Amino acid sequence: MALELEVVKTSGKPIGKISIASSATIKDLKKEIFKKYKLGVERQSIRNGPKGKDEKDSQEINKINLETPNTVYVKDLGPQIGWDTVFFLEYAGPIFLYGALFLFPHCFYGGKSLEQGRGHNARDIFPFYIFPVEQINKICGGSLIKVHDNAYYAGILWTIHYGKRILETAFVHRFSHGTMPIFNLFKNCSYYWGFAIYLAYHVNHPLHTAPPTWLFYLGVFIFLFCEVGNLSIHILLRNLRPEGSTVRKIPVPDSNPFTKLFNYVSCPNYTYEFGSWVGFTLLTGCFPVFIFALAGLYQMTVWAIGKHKKYRQEFPNYPKKRKAILPFLI
């Protein structure tokens, strides 16, 4: 049995009519709208009313409670970009921007103060920079490209963190949504890239005072511990979702001890992420890093609470003692 549906924009402007099987899904409807009216599938948000919520692609049309009989509403989400592309740009930017302040200190801090630097060649961490580093620094008034121990090791750990994120995007993450509005690319990149410049300026500053040795090693341990924990959670979440599907299951710990945090929070990947930046704060002794950690905690808490609520709504047997992101607190 076929359904005759009136397709209307959420603004109230009619688009046209679609004839489709009553057993068809929202995904099928999107494809028909694309065929007939050339509105890209990824740009469509199908709703049961002008102010209704976005219907899932797997939802059958005949099971939707339409506000107006035989009428569906479409919101154009605008130009889209792939999630993987967004993540690659988000995470590659901080490596290159941090590297710029690391490799060209004379251009940002002046030449004379850098003569007090000691120890390590900046090229060791960022060998992929194709620019004539020594020549550019000479133009800016100096030639010595040596950095103090704290900045050197912080640069290594910074690169490990964002390099890990890039590799996870390529080989680990499975996205429930293929695309996102292209506007979000500028918003997300502004956040990551802006903080990369802000942190790099302070951590690499020749007058930056490194923390005590014991605090540095404590910070390194916390950072690396949380990086491994974060990766462990991402691998577990990948294994929960079969490739090519949007299946959702209750995440529970596996044999990896780092996943035991699922006993306490719904989004332990965010917990570990925050922990990494607490560790980076300690190992650098840099207050701007702590500001970045708190900014990240705020945003991740918003995301975690949203995901936590979805889990509890979707799964009646969801563990009641779990918090969203911080054990026993939030």
Where are these regions (language model features)?
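Juxtamembrane membrane-interface segments at transmembrane-helix boundaries in membrane proteins
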Residues: 72-82, 117-149, 209-215, 248-258
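Short amphipathic, charge-patterned alpha-helical segments
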Residues: 19-48, 69
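Internal transmembrane alpha-helix with an interfacial aromatic "cap," most often the third helix
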Residues: 151, 155-180, 196-206
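Transmembrane alpha-helices of multi-pass eukaryotic membrane proteins
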Residues: 81-98, 148-161, 179-192, 210-223, ...
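Eukaryotic mixed-charge, acidic/polar low-complexity intrinsically disordered regions
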Residues: 23, 50-75
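Short, contiguous acidic and Ser/Thr-rich linear segments
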Residues: 10-28, 53-56
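Hydrophobic transmembrane alpha-helices
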Residues: 100-104, 208-330
